[in-house]
């Protein structure tokens, strides 16, 4: 009899929870329509995988890419609508959040065609790979719109869990297993520290979890200058620092870049930074409004360490992916300048513009590394010597992306850095901008060193990998060529006419 009553109570409670979830989705679903499209794509992928055979593999790519493109379209149709807070304060929809969501979707859309040839050659499980990519994208999008601590914690964990699984996707590779272990352990530790910081803010504000309500709570409790806020600031900076991977929170980055499958590295190298940057701008600017001097100082230290260590250590690397890992650490130092400048002096606009260019430059470089690695089986920088003699198209496109990463005019990277540094200079960050300019010159050195190897024609310098290189024919159905071409064009042309891009970024009201 007791069991019967308990069973009935369980059914009633489950029904209430289901009805509440259905009610929220019915009345608030339009606010997360782009995310709902991705969820539908995930369900469709699972259904087709259960009911189809290996001959239907092209459908998996088509469904994933279509879901992402439709989600981008839904975001564009929603552009410039009034800011809305939905799901009982958990989620905020505005232009600032949406432009970061657009960048994440753009990264994923370009990464899927970049991965097709790699998956086919290595015989990786395609369905799980695409499921993890879409789920990580979903987590990143929710993080961009998160408006309370629970969502800010759950969304990046969704992204991180998929990232761990993707980085260890080649289970028989010892380097991949080592990278995944480090990534998982450090990710778990950073999440714990992040939650510790949230708990201090929660207690100091009188039990508030929404970002704006925390500010009001700190005013009411008069705790906005208390030692607890300083502890919260340091803890949250460490937690977010792991996601952004600036120095000294970069220890996992080189190993994960070197050990993970190259398409996975391409995906993680941009999406994680975009999502973490979106979260960092809102967390630092709203709950820590009264501690702006303190978090500005912390971020300045991180930016200086990242720009110096990242670019100097990159010079000594012999692995292409490991070099790009340290290069990305230096690049995030430039992005932090935009976060520090903030809404004044177009800091956020310059940061968003530079991140758009960084996506194209970085993914274009990784597309070439994927193509070269599949044909030679090597990642050593010396093995790229003389590639121009065998595959001029690959060598030239790789050179353009590297030059754009270095910031040489008239490529997109130059104009992106120029506007970012100019905004920092106007905000009075003279020392930070000077370090950025000097380290940019250093980065040009190691990029030009690689380009010199690419263009060499000396037989004694050309390795057997290039001598036996099989050139990939340019075909209209070669997805990696399409992805690479889009990235190369986006790394060059937009820099010449970047005013429209800046205008769009400036329209993103915080």
Curated annotation (Swiss-Prot):
The chain crosses the membrane at residues 24-44, 59-79, 99-119, 124-144, 149-169, 183-203, 229-249, 295-315, 323-343, 347-367, 395-415, 418-438. GO terms for molecular function: NADH dehydrogenase (ubiquinone) activity; quinone binding. The keyword Chloroplast applies. It is an enzyme of class 7 (translocase). It catalyses: a plastoquinone + NADH + (n+1) H(+)(in) = a plastoquinol + NAD(+) + n H(+)(out); a plastoquinone + NADPH + (n+1) H(+)(in) = a plastoquinol + NADP(+) + n H(+)(out). NDH shuttles electrons from NAD(P)H:plastoquinone, via FMN and iron-sulfur (Fe-S) centers, to quinones in the photosynthetic chain and possibly in a chloroplast respiratory chain. The immediate electron acceptor for the enzyme in this species is believed to be plastoquinone. Couples the redox reaction to proton translocation, and thus conserves the redox energy in a proton gradient. Belongs to the complex I subunit 2 family. This is NAD(P)H-quinone oxidoreductase subunit 2, chloroplastic. It comes from Phormium tenax (New Zealand flax). The gene is ndhB.
């Amino acid at each position: 009899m007791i069991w019967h009553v308990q069973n009935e109570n369980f059914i009633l409670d489950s029904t209430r929870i289901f009805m509440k979830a259905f009610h929220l989705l019915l009345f608030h679903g339009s606010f997360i329509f782009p995310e709902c499209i991705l969820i539908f794509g995930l369900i469709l992928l699972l259904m087709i995988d259960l009911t189809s055979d290996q001959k239907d593999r092209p459908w998996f790519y088509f469904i994933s890419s279509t879901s992402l493109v439709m989600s981008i379209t839904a975001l564009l149709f929603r552009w410039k609508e009034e800011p809305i807070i939905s799901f009982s304060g958990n989620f905020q929809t505005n232009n600032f959040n949406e432009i970061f969501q657009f960048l994440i979707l753009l990264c994923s859309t370009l990464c899927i065609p970049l991965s097709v040839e790699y998956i086919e050659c290595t015989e990786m499980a395609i369905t799980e790979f695409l499921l993890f990519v879409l789920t990580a994208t979903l987590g990143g999008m929710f993080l961009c719109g998160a408006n309370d601590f629970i969502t800010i914690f759950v969304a990046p964990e969704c992204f991180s869990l998929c990232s761990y699984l993707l980085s260890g996707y080649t289970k028989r590779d010892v380097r991949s297993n080592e990278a995944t272990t480090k990534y998982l352990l450090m990710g778990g530790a950073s999440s714990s520290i992040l939650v510790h910081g949230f708990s201090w803010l929660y207690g100091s504000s009188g039990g508030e979890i929404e970002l704006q309500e925390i500010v009001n709570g700190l005013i009411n409790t008069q705790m906005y200058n208390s030692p607890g806020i300083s502890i919260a600031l340091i803890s949250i900076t460490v937690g977010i620092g792991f996601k952004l991977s600036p120095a000294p929170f970069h220890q996992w980055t080189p190993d994960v870049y070197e050990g993970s499958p190259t398409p996975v590295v391409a995906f993680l190298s941009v999406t994680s930074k975009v999502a973490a940057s979106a979260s960092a701008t809102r967390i630092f600017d709203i709950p820590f409004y009264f501690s702006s001097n303190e978090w500005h100082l912390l971020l300045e230290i991180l930016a200086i360490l990242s720009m110096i260590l990242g670019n100097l250590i990159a010079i000594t690397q012999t692995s292409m992916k490991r070099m790009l890992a340290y290069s990305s650490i230096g690049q995030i130092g430039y992005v932090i300048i935009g976060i520090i400048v903030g809404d004044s002096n177009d800091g956020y606009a310059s940061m968003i513009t530079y991140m758009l260019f960084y996506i194209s430059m970085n993914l274009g470089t990784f597309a070439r590394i994927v193509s070269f690695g599949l044909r030679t089986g090597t990642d050593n920088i010396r093995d790229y010597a003389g590639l121009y003699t065998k595959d001029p198209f690959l060598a030239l496109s790789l050179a353009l992306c590297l030059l754009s990463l270095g910031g040489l005019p008239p490529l997109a990277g130059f104009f992106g850095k120029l506007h970012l540094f100019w905004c920092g200079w106007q905000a009075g960050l003279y020392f930070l901008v000077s370090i950025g300019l000097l380290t940019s010159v250093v980065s040009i050195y190691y990029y030009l060193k690689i380009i010199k190897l690419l263009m060499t024609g000396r037989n004694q310098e050309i390795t057997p990998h290039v001598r036996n290189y099989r050139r990939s024919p340019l075909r209209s159905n070669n997805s990696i060529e399409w992805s690479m071409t889009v990235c190369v064009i986006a790394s060059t042309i937009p820099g010449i006419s970047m005013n429209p891009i800046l205008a769009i970024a400036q329209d993103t009201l915080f």
